[in-house]
């Protein structure tokens, strides 16, 4: 009898431990990144800060641009503030991996390869890869084949570099870890063309007093989304819900019209 009683006690003890363990696991799972962001009161956003019109320093020295304002509005919809973390592109995803930032908002193109490692929000801009040349050389590049034999500048580790290496043979690929140097090399003739976001290209032509020019049609369709570490479904859902709200209430279109003079969100 005593043995039976002890057996029942042992069984009840095991069940109690299992129940507590189960509750602990559930509680830990519920403590996701979204909760941490809300407890902190800030969303840590990685962006370049040297990539007009998306993110750059204004005359007052403060960061401004389409993606700066988008990040601020996104954070507002989450009930927090955006803490902007300027980072060079070639180290930005590493910063995301190491949890120094929560998200990347930097015209990150959604691709099958990137989706293997990162989660992406629904797209918030639609664009394409555009060739930009020195003013007067517009006729030199009309199609991707015209890039053959030319010195073409691209951001190091960007989808522009990936696309160029995969789709054009016989091109002299020059990589850059910052945009100003790339633009300067194009102006002085060290390279023949650069590949950039179509939206950035149109803005850049205006800001450089027409010393540069867009040439040919955009080479491919690009959808950009907010990049997150995998496994943070709570924050991903909140970001997607916020983007949907911004599309519905007109916030996203208003930002697009302000910075590009057109709706580039669809």
From Swiss-Prot:
GO terms for molecular function: amino acid binding; L-cystine transmembrane transporter activity; ligand-gated monoatomic ion channel activity. It is found in: Periplasm. SUPFAM superfamilies: Periplasmic binding protein-like II (SSF53850). The keyword Transport applies. GO terms for cellular component: ATP-binding cassette (ABC) transporter complex, substrate-binding subunit-containing; outer membrane-bounded periplasmic space. GO terms for biological process: cysteine transmembrane transport; diaminopimelate transport; L-cystine transport; sulfur utilization. Keywords: Amino-acid transport, Periplasm, Signal, Transport. Its main location: periplasm. Residues 1-29 form the signal peptide. Induction: Transcription is controlled by CysB. Expression is highly induced by H(2)O(2). Induced by sulfate. Also slightly induced by exogenous L-cysteine. Disruption phenotype: Disruption of the gene significantly impairs intracellular uptake of L-cystine. Mutants show a higher sensitivity to H(2)O(2) than wild-type cells. The tcyJ-tcyP double mutant is unable to import cystine and is completely resistant to both L-selenaproline and L-selenocystine. The double disruption of eamA and tcyJ increases cellular levels of lipid peroxides. The complex is composed of two ATP-binding proteins (TcyN), two transmembrane proteins (TcyL) and a solute-binding protein (TcyJ). Part of the ABC transporter complex TcyJLN involved in L-cystine import. This high affinity cystine transporter is involved in resistance to oxidative stress by forming a L-cysteine/L-cystine shuttle system with the EamA transporter, which exports L-cysteine as reducing equivalents to the periplasm to prevent the cells from oxidative stress. Exported L-cysteine can reduce the periplasmic hydrogen peroxide to water, and then generated L-cystine is imported back into the cytoplasm via the TcyJLN complex. Functions at low cystine concentrations. PANTHER family: L-CYSTINE-BINDING PROTEIN TCYJ, MEMBRANE-BOUND LYTIC MUREIN TRANSGLYCOSYLASE F. Belongs to the bacterial solute-binding protein 3 family. This is L-cystine-binding protein TcyJ.
